[in-house]
């Protein structure tokens, strides 16, 4: 998030007759835009936490104000409807999940097994509370076309960024683009499917075993690099 710079406005005072002492305001005023952005993020996080803890079917806007520690009037000023709060919760979840994935991608080095690392990142996302909350909103509020459309749009913005970076990482490691696209899509789909299954069948033991088998299948299929991967990690912008 980019904040506007804080500007201090100091009233001019007549020069002192003896000795003037320079003073600064110990409590500079924070610009309205920055205060508004902070409040919106605070409410978005609170909305996410309420849905995570109680489920979207029990989601009440009054609970968001209580969790955020603000008045309902302040909440309504920034998010006047339940849908706008739900959208804010989704945006918060996706931004946090995306930041986590970008950090994992940035830590990847060519000596790592790229498919195993991809599966680790995929598992961290699809088994997270972030994904569970988004899925809960989609399923419980799926009949609301506006909410569904905004959820899909937000998901595409954030997840396409992560998947694009993984695709670039595979290509940088020497993978052919068609193979990289197919393996990336299959890897994500496998993990997503098991994450949904985990909602009714707890435990990850089977998934972890099959995940390791998928990594081995990809290696045995000869779908890996067709050229030597670079030794140094990429300096491209994430």
Language-model features, listed with the residues they occupy:
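Helix-turn-helix
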Residues: 42, 46, 50-84, 88
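Hydrophobic/aromatic-rich alpha-helical bundle segments in the mid-to-C-terminal region
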Residues: 147-152, 169-238
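Generic hydrophobic, amphipathic alpha-helix propensity
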Residues: 36-47, 64, 89-93, 97, ...
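Hydrophobic alpha-helical connector segments
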Residues: 84, 88-91, 101-131, 183-187, ...
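Amphipathic alpha-helical packing segments from all-alpha helical-bundle domains
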Residues: 98-99, 103, 126-135, 145-171, ...
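Residues at secondary-structure transition points
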Residues: 27-34, 38, 80, 84, ...
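Short helix-capping/turn signature of helix-turn-helix
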Residues: 79, 124, 137-143
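N-terminal intrinsically disordered/low-complexity leader segments
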Residues: 1-38, 225-238
